[in-house]
Design a protein with these regions (language model features):
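Mid-domain alpha/beta scaffold segments of enzyme catalytic cores
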Residues: 1-276
């Protein structure tokens, strides 16, 4: 944490050692999992303490496990604003496909009174080579969600893992969505197929890529260097980036457990390493 004063993340600080993040500046996390926030070492009391002095934050909460769609977790913090996406992640596929996809449609058609979240997108959805489900089944669910997104004109949040996944996903995107559709390709990093991602950004005019701590490959500096070179080579890339944490996943090794929270990982680690 060399760039930003850690104290300034949570309150006003008068030290002159580092850059201070203005307390009035809202922070933004483009991809996280609110219902899983407090399953590990982070707790609700610490979370509320971080916002007690007025720091505001906007979270894009990703409900990627269909069996948890109806388990709403409310943070009840006046300084926190949450927008929610609903989708079927390729590692968590249902056996009763038609029923669950219909549930997904009904969620966005506001047919469930017990869901009060502000719904903003379908996802995360896509293909994952580490999934226990076949690519054929993953592809079926991916197509169904893209079809629904097109019908309801909903933004899409993408998940792709495994180099073979990217071109397949890009082809399906072009088949099901028009070039102006709003798309956020989550978790782009040195292991992504960057040629496909470049083509994706060029084809879909309202497309964005999500960057989180997975862009830092401390055990593979060559890949990290190549990724950074690719990143700065993309025209107007600064307008195409969504900063995200994927919290509570992707804990960076550089942070201690007590430092690992949506604010610290979303601000300090990403910005500090980008300056390097």
């Amino acid at each position: 944490m060399n760039a930003i004063c850690e104290n300034s993340l949570y309150s006003k600080c008068s030290c002159k050692n580092k850059y201070h993040l203005p307390l009035a500046l809202p922070l933004y996390d483009g991809h996280c999992h609110i219902d899983l926030f407090f399953r590990y070492e982070f707790n609700k009391n610490d979370f509320d303490t971080q916002f007690a002095n007025g720091r505001k934050m906007i979270f894009i909460d990703n409900k990627h496990q269909y069996y948890r769609w109806f388990t709403d977790y409310h943070l009840n913090n006046p300084n926190v604003k949450i927008f929610t996406t609903y989708g079927i992640h390729p590692k968590y596929l249902p056996s009763n496909i038609s029923y669950v996809v219909k549930e997904l449609e009904n969620i966005f058609m506001n047919k469930y009174n017990n869901i009060i979240a502000e719904k903003v997108a379908i996802g995360e959805c896509g293909l994952d080579s580490t999934s226990s489900f076949s690519f054929e089944l993953q592809l079926t669910l991916f197509k169904m969600q893209l079809t629904l997104a097109a019908q309801l004109n909903l933004p899409v949040v993408l998940h792709g893992r495994g180099i073979e996944s990217f071109n397949l996903m890009f082809n399906e995107l072009k088949l099901h969505l028009n070039p102006t559709h709003r798309i956020h390709w989550h978790c782009i990093n040195p292991k992504s197929d960057l040629n496909v991602i470049a083509a994706f950004l060029n084809y879909f005019k309202n497309s964005y890529i999500g960057l989180n701590c997975s862009i830092f490959s401390h055990d593979d500096l060559e890949s990290q260097t190549l990724f950074h070179k690719w990143l700065v080579s993309v025209e107007n890339i600064i307008y195409k980036i969504i900063l995200e944490t994927d919290f509570p996943f992707l804990k960076p090794s550089i942070l201690e457990s007590k430092q690992y929270n949506p604010i610290s990982v979303g601000v300090d680690h990403i910005k500090d390493n980008q300056h390097k």
